[in-house]
Every structure is written in C-alpha cells, then in structure tokens.
C-alpha cells in the first residue's frame, strides 16, 4: 500500500450499535471501492462521566465483543481490512484480542502519551489524526512515535465543521 492511496470507509459508530447494519455499511464500503473500514470502539464507563451526552451516546451505540468478533470475521471473508480507533485502554485491549492490522489514534487522543505508548506496543501500522493540534504538538507527536514505530501516518484533518475557507 506504500505506493497508492488507502481508501478508508469511516463507519465510526454510525452502525448505531447494530451488527447487521454495520455489515450492511461494510458491504456499501466494498461496493464503493474502499480498501478498509474503520470503527470507533469506546468503553463509555471508562471514558465518560455517566451524566454526559457522550456517555449515553457511546453506551447506546456500542458493539459488544462478540459482535465485533463476528464483524471482524465477516470482513476477512469479504476481503476488506477492518481496524478501529480505541477510545480507552479497554478498547485497545479489544483491538489487540481481535488482531486488527492497523490502529488509528483520534484527534481527541493524539496527545495522550499513555494510550499512544500502549498502542505502539502492539507493533501495528498506526494512523494519527492531527485535528485540534498546533505545529508544536504535531512535532512532539511525530518525534514520540518515530522513536518507536517507523510505520505510521499523520493525517491533517479539520475538527470543526463547517471548515473555514482557509482550510
């Protein structure tokens, strides 16, 4: 994949916590020519206070381990890569157990050295989103990751929508 664009279909939590719907989205990604699909895995109990909207949202729309396992097998049968963004250590352990081939660090966690360091221990190709970071933070992220993993990509992205004309 080094000499071509990797097309990633971002499913995130748009599967609405529904395994069948997630598989339908994967089929659509395949039809559209995607090379891989990406999910977001978050354990709301570990990541958010119970009174927050984020807690309710991620609790409602999460896939359990068995569903993720079946979806992973489905993707293997369909010959499309599946990987995920972990939101916490529990989610990172799921990625490890399911042996996902790539790991993605979100913009919101790109300065979380502990999560990144634990992710680096999986020795996987890593994609790091750089939304909400300034030039100084980007340099620190680059240096930190480069010391431990030569197989990574930094993605410049917009975290505020709609983006300004200068972006």
Question: What kind of region is each of these model predictions?
Answer:
Residues 1-167:
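Catalytic cores and adjacent flexible loops of soluble metabolic enzymes
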């Amino acid at each position: 994949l080094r000499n071509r664009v990797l097309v990633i279909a971002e499913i995130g939590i748009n599967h609405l916590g529904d395994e069948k719907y997630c598989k339908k989205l994967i089929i659509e990604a395949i039809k559209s020519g995607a090379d891989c699909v990406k999910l977001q895995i978050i354990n709301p109990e570990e990541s958010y206070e119970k009174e927050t909207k984020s807690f309710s949202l991620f609790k409602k729309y999460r896939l359990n381990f068995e569903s993720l396992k079946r979806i992973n097998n489905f993707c293997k049968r369909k010959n499309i890569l599946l990987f995920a963004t972990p939101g916490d250590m529990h989610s990172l352990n799921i990625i490890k157990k399911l042996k996902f081939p790539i790991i993605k660090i979100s913009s919101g966690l790109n300065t979380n050295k502990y999560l990144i360091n634990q992710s680096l221990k999986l020795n996987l190709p890593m994609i790091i989103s750089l939304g909400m970071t300034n030039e100084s933070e980007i340099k620190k992220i680059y240096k930190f990751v480069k010391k431990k993993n030569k197989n990574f990509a930094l993605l410049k992205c917009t975290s505020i929508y709609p983006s300004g004309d200068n972006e």
